Amino acid sequence: MRFVAGEYDVCVVGLGHAGSEAALASARLGLSTVGFATNLDAIALMACNPSIGGPAKAQLVREIDALGGQMAINTDKSLLQMRTLNTSKGPAVRSLRAQVDKKLYQMNMKHTLERQENLDIKQAEIVDILVEDNKVTGVVTKLGAIYKCKACIITTGTFLKGRVIIGEVDFESGPSGLFPASELSEALKRLGFKLMRFKTGTPPRVDKRSIDFSKMEIQPGDEVITPFSFMHDKIEIEQMPCWLTYTNEKTHKIIRDNIHRAPLFTGAITGVGVRYCPSIEDKVVKFPHRERHQIFIEPEGRDTYEMYVQGMSSSLPEDVQLEFLRTVPGLENVRVMRPAYAIEYDCIDPTQLKATLESKWIEGLYFAGQVNGTSGYEEAAAQGLMAGINAAMKILNKPPVVLDRSQAYIGILIDDLVTKGTNEPYRMLTSRAEYRLLLRQDNADFRLTEIGKEIGLVTEERYEKFLRKKIQLEKEMRRLSTVMVRPTEEVNNFLISRGSTPLVSGVDLYTLLKRPEVDYKSTKFLDPDRPDDILDSVAEQIDINIKYEGYILKQLRQVEQFKAMENKKIPEDIDYYQISGLSNEAKEKLSKIRPTSVGQASRISGVSPADISVLLIYLQQMRKKKSNESRIS
């Protein structure tokens, strides 16, 4: 029997990485919010790797932080190790990667949710979404409780009709042995949503005490930790190392000899898997000439012996897993604490959503995270934040917040999903960003904190900290162009020692810093009036802004062209089938996606440059016609 148990502005279904950010954003914007999890002990569960960040993902985490989200703060609080990746490459692809204590991360996030004003969290499985006149009105729990709401955000991760597969064995399950959510899938189908079936997997967890680390290469963290959150100036902890080892021909032979037992190849797995995170059996089959594959052994926490075997995701039977693990140097006597498994789950086709992550036909119903076909904690958290913001904006009768591709990786992520869709679990990559030199992890605050302040998520403390940094950077950039450096013996010896050409005549320090061999910090002795309180983050910005000035200006000009196309808006009620000259495929795709701008239309697969030219002419004719009609009237 159903009964009304409560009424809120916003209901969030699922409290993983997407749901946690969505619930916090909504509550922090003043809306009464309730978040549901099938198990409150699994809030912000890190069901797979014990890490946050990496290429493109670190940029997402920094953007979440700059807008006022929680992930970066929580990562810093739960840190085991921090490494900066791609240090030998350009700033566009440099990325932080944090090893975190899984349980501490969960505990910190749960504590944050519990303390948040305007937010209740409840343990319940949601089995139905209530809709009247194409508007969300509430949700229903398995026990029959109805919670009325004005907006609902679905953030169910990999729980929808979850099925775990290990060799010949399969059973209904969510990740990490949790219950799946099967009834909500059927409810979404009844509401008209097209569902897809995706697959992901996770490697074994092994007992640290059974590992011989002397046969592995140690992977320490950075000597000086760079925090993920712009709110933190420094972090001082005792870091835990990771370890590197490799598979070998013995490993590969065992896998090949048992490939007939691999669900991936027997047809037992029907879901589409993650391209950029293949299982070990997939790697052995697809790359038969590779003599070895990297395996990283990563700690799962300070107070556990469990170690994560990165690079060995598998759905092979448990006995085969143990056999191939014990061929790896250092793992000869390994004890498995949790076997690897694959998990299949339902997700929606994200082209059914607007750029706000709201359903195109059910008002107030939003989706975020892996339910939208993405993979990764960071991608989920980014979507959750934006869904929470936009659900709140709608209820508050404020304009929606949509970041474009020139503003943030978050904008690229969502635009790709709603414009192109995905036929496999979507992972954010730096190669997806057209303007990646502008969208660096180091400048996320300069790009987005003002927007976060306008939304209402950025606190006064964060904003004041940002303004101090911004003013310091602007002042120092101006001052450097007034500092003259003479071609003295000391100066030229310094330049020669750096592998740089000696000066023949005087030059300002701003110009000197354009040289790749010279950096801001090393030139302090040339600059006696330099302020002593320059932040490390400001010094980094100075070097990047000066050295890459030409490339940055070039990308800014490209952004102007991009914005011009984005600003050419398309009426919501346009009938593409009435536009002569459009290809049939373009008519079909444009009618399905309903792009809001010519720029978005140009990114739809199957819409050619010729179709865009026809569309531009049609829109111009429409504007002229309306202009003439308004003059006549």
From Swiss-Prot:
FAD binds at residues 14-19. Keywords: Cytoplasm, FAD, Flavoprotein, NAD, tRNA processing. The keyword Flavoprotein applies. PROSITE patterns: GIDA_1 (PS01280), GIDA_2 (PS01281). SUPFAM superfamilies: FAD/NAD(P)-binding domain (SSF51905). It is found in: Cytoplasm. NAD(+) binds at residues 273-287. GO terms for biological process: tRNA methylation; tRNA wobble uridine modification. InterPro entries: FAD/NAD-bd_sf, GIDA_C_N, MnmG, MnmG-rel, MnmG-rel_CS, MnmG_C, MnmG_C_subdom, MnmG_C_subdom_sf. GO terms for cellular component: cytosol. The keyword Flavoprotein applies. GO terms for molecular function: flavin adenine dinucleotide binding. It comes from the Bacteria. It holds the Pfam family SAM_GIDA_C. Its cofactor is FAD. NAD-binding protein involved in the addition of a carboxymethylaminomethyl (cmnm) group at the wobble position (U34) of certain tRNAs, forming tRNA-cmnm(5)s(2)U34. Homodimer. Heterotetramer of two MnmE and two MnmG subunits. Belongs to the MnmG family. This is tRNA uridine 5-carboxymethylaminomethyl modification enzyme MnmG 1. It comes from Caldanaerobacter subterraneus subsp. tengcongensis (strain DSM 15242 / JCM 11007 / NBRC 100824 / MB4) (Thermoanaerobacter tengcongensis). The lineage of its organism: Bacteria, Bacillati, Bacillota, Clostridia, Thermoanaerobacterales.
